[in-house]
Curated annotation (Swiss-Prot):
This is Uncharacterized HTH-type transcriptional regulator YbaQ. Coiled coil: none annotated. GO terms for molecular function: DNA binding. It comes from Escherichia coli (strain K12). Pfam families: HTH_3. Residues 27-46 bind DNA. SMART domains: HTH_XRE. Keywords: DNA-binding, Transcription, Transcription regulation. Disulfide bonds: none annotated. InterPro entries: Cro/C1-type_HTH (IPR001387), Lambda_DNA-bd_dom_sf (IPR010982), Toxin_antidote_HigA (IPR013430). Belongs to the VapA/VapI family.
Length: 113
């Protein structure tokens, strides 16, 4: 596992601090622009929901950005969470490569033959 770094900024934080606050947009106003329920926007901003591809398309349209901008923010957070989750790293450490598996299978076959 690599050394822990600061968690990347979430799409919700970017949305709040780089878009809503500077533009003086309220959650319900953004929800109206996005054609989604207010709770969807609120959950994203409060980091209670991950950004979906569909929402990335909607945000890109509303703010004239790229879909990749939003998806890359979420991907960075997702990668950080996996890389810094000890339990997940332990599980990943038990996974063998296909080359290791094939070598082990070949060794077993030699012993049987």
């Amino acid at each position: 596992m690599k050394q822990a770094t600061r968690k990347p900024t979430t799409p919700g934080d970017i949305l709040l601090y780089e878009y809503l606050e500077p533009l003086d947009l309220k959650i319900n106003e953004l929800a109206e622009l996005l054609h989604v329920h207010r709770n969807s926007v609120s959950a994203l901003i409060n980091n209670n929901r991950k950004l979906t591809t569909e929402m990335a398309f909607r945000l890109a349209k509303v703010f004239d950005t790229t879909v990749d901008f939003w998806l890359n923010l979420q991907a960075a957070v997702d990668l950080w969470e996996v890389e810094n989750n000890m339990r997940t790293q332990e599980e990943l450490g038990r996974i063998e490569t296909v080359a290791e598996y094939l070598a082990r299978r070949e060794e077993r076959a030699k012993k049987v033959a």
